[in-house]
């Protein structure tokens, strides 16, 4: 970075938005890295930005993949639009060639029927009706006659000729050059002897040329019925019998790619002035649109009906469209087209210009009238109009849905198209997610090349060769460290994600059947600050709800127990060592708590541990029921507590929040019943259910474990799924065993344990940890195999981790000096208490001192513990346990300190005090007084002695002094002598004269000032 160039900075909220993460999550990570930031709006430098990107690289990669998929989808949509536009152009070009063919065939058919009876009259441009009779091939006529379709005749609409408008039949503009008296639609139907009704015409789809006024020979009406929205055209014809149908030609997306040559046009007289659009009126039938020829000879007469349906379905017509187009192309010879126009006038009398049209030149006809018509209609060739890009852009979505959608089912087809697009999008996103997941290898730390090869789908030989290339010589079963696994996975295009040995060997379970699910009791944890009445509330509930007077029934100290309220409704309470154990369980993923009762003393305040308990409950997604305890005291102030809780984010229902609150007195039992009712209400809202099937392998969570002298390892298990039975083989973490006995909280033996029921389990081979998941296996062999796999991984992990910690410790001590450590051995009654103590002690440390846990275990203090403490210079902390006789004698002999506690907070306070005593004290300078030298005396064998006057303070004989000359320090040391009148004194007060000499310094002068001070040590705090 050059001088004056500012370092680029990033806002935390912008980084979170880029990674699609919560700003609080990014802020918490930045704070963990030791960076001081105030809020999510704070700015960080590039180094911190790099740390965030490296930490959340997986999220960053997922965001990049999502953006890549989105870009590909947009590119694919653009390509689809381009293909649709090209398809539309091809369709328009092909319709230019096919439409004149159909019009020529229709005109020829009309002419052949009406020629014998026609008497042509004079007009500006008279065209014989039989001029195009030979334009229709015989093969096409035979095909149409062979497949007729009968439909009900529809009333024909009469429209005045001057108001005739071009009809638009398609949603897209067709570039065909229209001709006179021709429409680019099919099939055609002639209606005979039908009443004529004058109604408004609807807007058609195809652009059709205007009708040129002809000399009417006879009155007839031609009704043109197209698929979807059709057009009715009334022309002056004299038809003796129904004319054969023209084969239907429907518009389809599957158009021929071949280029159609120009077609010989029909001659016409062009108009000079364009006419304004005529008024459109709706018809009776929306599927029919009619146009009437000029009424010149006394009106129109319907003489017959022509059935043009072929009897085939819409799909078959679409399918055969290409075949018909190819047949027509081979049948007719295509020549150049010329513009055709007509001088039709609108109702306002303005001449309207017709659009150019194309016509097909037929083979040599049998009649000379057709030849004369061809010669008369030759004209000048006109350039085709360009494609209207605006129309294509406006109708591109409809083009994608289906170009030939005119059957009235457009909404359904659009819906199906939308659903199909959604499915394709979901499939693409799922494929991208699967591809991303396939590139992630979930592996345990210190895995072997053989295990890593199986996970990545390659051979172990490839991994060993890659290790050789990296300078590592390994065998197939040798354990790799974390850095090597990450590097090897990256070389093969994978990303390593490390999981614990329990997650790597997790037992897959089937989904619970609906018929096996039943309502289960809620699991409630009581949390709160120390001395706020948590233990008192538990004691009252147990005394009032547990059955008393049972023979030999002594309430056991367990981590969970069950009470019955309202006759048959049960609640399970967790008696954990506090919120520390709750945090440990949540960290292991054991969400065993359904509801949290937050106890707050009404005569106190919301303490920091109360806030911490609230945060733990919210992070676990557990509802909170607030219990305001000690309400019977005179100094109780519930409103103040409610206000403080609202500031902490817990707004009770009375104040418009969602958290229930109950005022209680744990000692007098006030409000306890109402509190239980609110807990049950919260449980009903959550609809807690459990699997009670005996066929399902049971599972549960270890609440706590202890070592009983007569029973061995005893663990308290909270069943979560299935039914736990005596004799079931199981695995819990790295421990295994077989259920030898089940006991409830009163020590009574039971045979079955159901969901949400706490039970004491006997039969563990090793002591499990609190929070481990107990899973019942199908056989003892399966349980042993699974436990051995976990134990191997754990031993390797512990061995590598301990070695690495020692090396790190050596490097740290070389870099920072020797750190003072307080070695501690913990023995407790339960595993849950040990974990709570260990977590609390590890938090008490700073850069100079810390707690080093030498050993921790469950059970009484033994001789082995004493010997270990003596060898490592450690202290022993006994939590609710005592040493045996031999251990006590050995501790007295070794002069070893053993501390006994029953409250976890007392342990933390004493250890914190001990660590503070190990800290180096802070040194402060305390000023005592100042002396001014006013005269110098020369004493033999002593040197210069100053005659002084004490300006302020008190100067003791043993004080440290500094000599100042003109405000500059000249000397710092101690006094050699302090006298008054030849007598040595211990101190001289302010306002007195004295004589002094400095130790090892003789250069003093009149006017110098001597300051007296001393160094004071101050005790440091953690």
Swiss-Prot record:
InterPro entries per UniProt: EF-G-like_DII, IF2_II, IF2_N, P-loop_NTPase, Small_GTP-bd, T_Tr_GTP-bd_dom, TF_IF2_bacterial-like, TIF_IF2
Protein localization: Cytoplasm
Pfam families: EF-G_D2 (PF22042), GTP_EFTU (PF00009), IF-2 (PF11987), IF2_N (PF04760)
Region span, G4: 629-632
Comp. bias (Basic residues): 375-384
Keyword 4Fe-4S: no
Keyword Aminoacyl-tRNA synthetase: no
Chain intervals for the UniProt region annotation (G2): 553-557
Any single Gene Ontology cellular-component annotation: cytoplasm
Domain of life: Bacteria
Cysteine pairs bridged by disulfides in the record: none
Family: Belongs to the TRAFAC class translation factor GTPase superfamily. Classic translation factor GTPase family. IF-2 subfamily.
Biological role: One of the essential components for the initiation of protein synthesis. Protects formylmethionyl-tRNA from spontaneous hydrolysis and promotes its binding to the 30S ribosomal subunits. Also involved in the hydrolysis of GTP during the formation of the 70S ribosomal complex.
HAMAP family reported in the protein's UniProt record: IF_2_B
Record-given protein name: Translation initiation factor IF-2
Lineage per the UniProt record: Bacteria, Pseudomonadati, Chlorobiota, Chlorobiia, Chlorobiales
Gene name, Swiss-Prot/TrEMBL: infB
